[in-house]
């Protein structure tokens, strides 16, 4: 049995498109919540550093459900949000055909235990008898984290990264990588990965999206969150990447609630900073201005792709 707090894919896509067009957020149907999770609206990267033998199995499953054959041999395979949606739906249908159940629009609200053992769970759509429960809630289900801690479960602070999205012309990335060969059809879209140690911390780029766009990824009202997304062709004019720094338990006295409060505070400040430009508009400035602390934005050759302005 799989419980998903958000809707099935078709309904979810409509909700995301509605939010993009109007700024009206559905807190349970968005770029974080719904069938496929946050990965549905992403670059669809299949790269990992863990080297587990199950990685090959995952690739085979993706291929069986419609992913492009190139993911089996490319050094940096990716599916793209457009093709990934069909793969996700196909996997879910096979689970159902084999006797599994997927309950959409069903959020976990509580649990019951007896003699230290789990006996059942409470949801927005009823109660389920349950002896084994796997949480795969991502990092945005903060209400679920709070419910678990209120119920007596001990949660630990996991390191996470915080930062912003940087956009630049894809053509300039490729010129810097390929020089005079830039634009040759045999070459893949240019990618990069940067890192720099600053004191005890490391600043680095993450989830670089060649030819992609920046999307509004809020799942709580009054907060701005950004993410990067690419289609399979990666043929957009801009590239984008997250520029982030890691924070961990010691930054929050090993208190998960303080870590969550920190995230919410930053997201609320971003919402307030962009509010004058519209609902869920994001604050922006030129990178050079950011580095110099000037807070200025002059839009030139790079046109921001963030869909809420």
Predicted regions: what they are:
Residues 1-309:
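Residues forming the flavin
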């Amino acid at each position: 049995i799989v419980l998903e707090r958000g809707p099935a894919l078709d309904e979810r896509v409509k909700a995301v498109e509605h939010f993009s067009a109007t700024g009206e957020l559905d807190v349970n149907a968005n770029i974080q919540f719904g069938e496929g999770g946050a990965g549905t609206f992403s670059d669809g990267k299949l790269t990992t550093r863990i080297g587990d033998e199950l990685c090959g199995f995952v690739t085979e499953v993706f291929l069986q459900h419609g992913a492009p054959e190139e993911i089996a041999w490319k050094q940096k395979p990716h599916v793209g949000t457009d093709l990934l949606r069909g793969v996700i739906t196909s996997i879910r249908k096979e689970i159902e055909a084999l006797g599994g159940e997927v309950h959409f629009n069903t959020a976990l609200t509580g649990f019951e235990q007896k003699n230290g053992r789990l006996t059942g769970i409470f949801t927005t759509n009823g109660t389920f008898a349950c002896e084994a429960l796997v949480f795969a809630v991502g990092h945005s289900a903060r209400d679920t984290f709070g419910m678990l801690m209120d119920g007596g479960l001990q949660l630990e602070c996991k390191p996470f990264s915080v930062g912003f999205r940087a956009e630049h012309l894809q053509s300039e990335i490729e010129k810097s990588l390929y020089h005079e060969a830039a634009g040759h059809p045999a070459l893949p879209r240019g990618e990069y990965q940067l890192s720099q140690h600053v004191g005890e911390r490391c600043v680095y780029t993450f989830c670089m999206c060649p030819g992609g766009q920046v999307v509004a990824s809020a799942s709580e009202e009054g907060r701005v969150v950004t993410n990067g997304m690419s289609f399979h062709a990666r043929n957009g004019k801009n590239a984008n990447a997250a520029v982030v720094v890691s924070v961990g338990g010691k930054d929050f006295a090993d208190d998960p609630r303080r870590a969550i409060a920190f995230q919410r505070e930053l997201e609320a400040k971003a919402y307030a900073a962009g509010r004058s430009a519209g609902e869920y508009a994001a604050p922006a400035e030129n990178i050079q201005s950011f580095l110099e602390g000037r807070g200025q934005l002059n839009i030139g050759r790079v046109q921001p792709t963030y869909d809420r302005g």
